[in-house]
């Protein structure tokens, strides 16, 4: 589409190694540079507490991280700064008139250069669809939503964090910012 996309980074440390703390540190680096709009996507809503724990452990305030579901789909997010926590299930949700993806993109703005953390990034596996045991299967909705978010915010600083990454190379199709395929790759 003619956009220059910022390259992403994959954090593949094992379970319990502190990937959440490292993700929080990436956000804090930008926060201290005055860039105060970030998106933290994770497996489910209860992990908000883990994100807040990691953020506060390095000096942030719990109130800096707010879950997107505090606002109804389609409602404008009034807080101009902060970290929006979005479970994958919320990211893919929609109503006839609007989607959560559109809502978070409007909040971020077209000039967004914040960090997008895809915690448990393997949850976006299967985005490309393919052949399943029972025939052709469609791509996963949350994987598609994750790729659309990356494509819509080309200047975002994308961090994929997962202890498992992918069980099959096709399940890395969500990691579009790694430069694994496409023009200019080997």
What residue ranges belong to the model's regions?
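Pre-Walker A (Motif I) flank of P-loop NTPase domains
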Residues: 4-13, 36, 154-157
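Hydrophobic positions in the central parallel beta-sheet of the AAA+
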Residues: 9-10, 84-86, 116, 159
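Conserved Walker A/P-loop ATP-binding site and its immediately adjacent core
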Residues: 19-22, 26-67, 88-90, 165-171
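Signature of the SF2 helicase/ATPase Hel1-core->accessory helical subdomain module
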Residues: 25-29, 33, 46, 90-186
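Inter-Walker segment of RecA-like/P-loop motor cores
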Residues: 59-100
């Amino acid at each position: 589409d003619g956009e220059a996309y910022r390259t992403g980074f994959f954090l593949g440390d094992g379970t319990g190694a502190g990937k959440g703390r490292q993700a929080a540190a990436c956000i804090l680096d930008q926060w201290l540079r005055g860039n105060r709009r970030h998106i933290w996507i994770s497996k489910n809503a209860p992990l908000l507490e883990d994100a807040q724990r990691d953020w506060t452990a390095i000096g942030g305030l719990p109130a800096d991280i707010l879950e997107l579901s505090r606002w109804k789909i389609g409602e404008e997010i009034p807080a101009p700064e902060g970290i929006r926590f979005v479970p994958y299930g919320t990211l893919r949700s929609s109503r006839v008139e609007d989607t959560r993806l559109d809502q978070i993109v409007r909040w971020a703005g077209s000039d967004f250069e914040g960090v997008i953390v895809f915690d448990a990034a393997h949850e976006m596996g299967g985005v490309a669809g393919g052949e399943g045991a029972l025939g052709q299967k469609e791509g996963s909705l949350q994987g598609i939503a994750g790729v659309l978010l990356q494509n819509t915010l080309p200047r975002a600083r994308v961090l994929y964090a997962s202890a498992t990454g992918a069980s099959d190379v096709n399940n890395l199709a969500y990691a579009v910012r790694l430069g694994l395929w496409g023009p200019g790759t080997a």
